[in-house]
Amino acid sequence: MALWGGRFTQAADQRFKQFNDSLRFDYRLAEQDIVGSVAWSKALVTVGVLTAEEQVQLEEALNVLLEDVRARPQQILESDAEDIHSWVEGKLIDKVGQLGKKLHTGRSRNDQVATDLKLWCKDTVSELLTANRQLQSALVETAENNQDAVMPGYTHLQRAQPVTFAHWCLAYVEMLARDESRLQDALKRLDVSPLGCGALAGTAYEIDREQLAGWLGFASATRNSLDSVSDRDHVLELLSAAAIGMVHLSRFAEDLIFFNTGEAGFVELSDRVTSGSSLMPQKKNPDALELIRGKCGRVQGALTGMMMTLKGLPLAYNKDMQEDKEGLFDALDTWLDCLHMAALVLDGIQVKRPRCQEAAQQGYANATELADYLVAKGVPFREAHHIVGEAVVEAIRQGKPLEELPLSELQKFSQVIGEDVYPILSLQSCLDKRAAKGGVSPQQVAQAIAFAQARLG
């Protein structure tokens, strides 16, 4: 059934109807639409539109419909209703007859859909927060199990300084913690109810909107009706959080894809998250990680698309706003799926410690330690930097690591170098010296793990 029509003398062209209808995607708001309708029926009692008995009859019918939708959601898509609001109202009228036609009194689809979408967003943010924290916990557990797995850290994809696999895991815990904070922050601004704002100017019925907001679980009601039906900031904020979160997951995926290559060989992924080749029998492809990396683009696109949709819209509601849902649904679904998949990748990952250690010992990753050693001997850092650069060139020429150059060779570059330099150049010394907060020393990594465990509970 259509919720409008008296003004028109011709039926809508079928092609326009298909173009205009939104049920194929806003069916996902069915539960929220029904819950919002129950609350609205209670509000209508307070202003004398419904009797208490009528409200009970409507609420009972709506609750039956809610259970029916939860049991068989696919039934919605069997309808040719224009949108989810039309579908719910049509089903309600089928159940209670003329009484169902009173429910929309004082309400517009403009404030109705804004309310539905905010309720959906609140539910989805809760799911995202749970999945985010589960991935953080998986990373912390992996870190705890790999505190002694020394590996090269990279800048410019060149070996730079030794780190540990645990320290690498904890870097992504920090990123995910910021993602968690962004979601929680967005939820604060999202948690206001637009229901009762009507089409744009507010409702003509003296409904207590704060009470109505409380019935729906919102912290408060919105303050301006024009803004309330026009506002899609919460969509932009969640898309932005998703875009940033997916960038973090994409970087996580790219790191592990590289670590998993034959050239690096730092990790081996579980068979449960890899696939083979139809031609090459030896292949074990990191498809789960590649898909996480690939799906990042569609989420960035959803954010950009929504920004462009909103940028030129006048107040208040415009049909353009119907375009807010598909991108949002897809982006948050994608983010949620990727959070779950990233946790699955960590479940069963094998860190190849000997290969990690071997790589950490290559590439002159201890060169900075030699420079710091010279500084401790009174050599200005800039001069020490130059001296070590020359020493590295000589070590490369001889095909040796720095620690295998004899003292006589090292002293050609600086006479302050003594026998005490060799312990300084060990991998363990490189790690131990990074003992400032946030560093890679075993003590700092252990503290970071303990802090994350306490925060995650």
UniProtKB/Swiss-Prot annotation:
Keywords: Amino-acid biosynthesis, Arginine biosynthesis, Cytoplasm, Lyase. InterPro entries: Arg_succ_lyase_C, Argininosuccinate_lyase, Fumarase/histidase_N, Fumarate_lyase_CS, Fumarate_lyase_fam, Fumarate_lyase_N, L-Aspartase-like. Pathway: Amino-acid biosynthesis; L-arginine biosynthesis; L-arginine from L-ornithine and carbamoyl phosphate: step 3/3. It catalyses: 2-(N(omega)-L-arginino)succinate = fumarate + L-arginine. It holds the Pfam family ASL_C2. One of its GO terms (molecular function) is argininosuccinate lyase activity. Its EC number is 4.3.2.1. It is found in: Cytoplasm. It comes from the Bacteria. PROSITE patterns: FUMARATE_LYASES (PS00163). One of its GO terms (cellular component) is cytosol. One of its GO terms (biological process) is arginine biosynthetic process via ornithine. Its main location: cytoplasm. Belongs to the lyase 1 family. Argininosuccinate lyase subfamily. This is Argininosuccinate lyase. The lineage of its organism: Bacteria, Pseudomonadati, Pseudomonadota, Gammaproteobacteria, Enterobacterales.
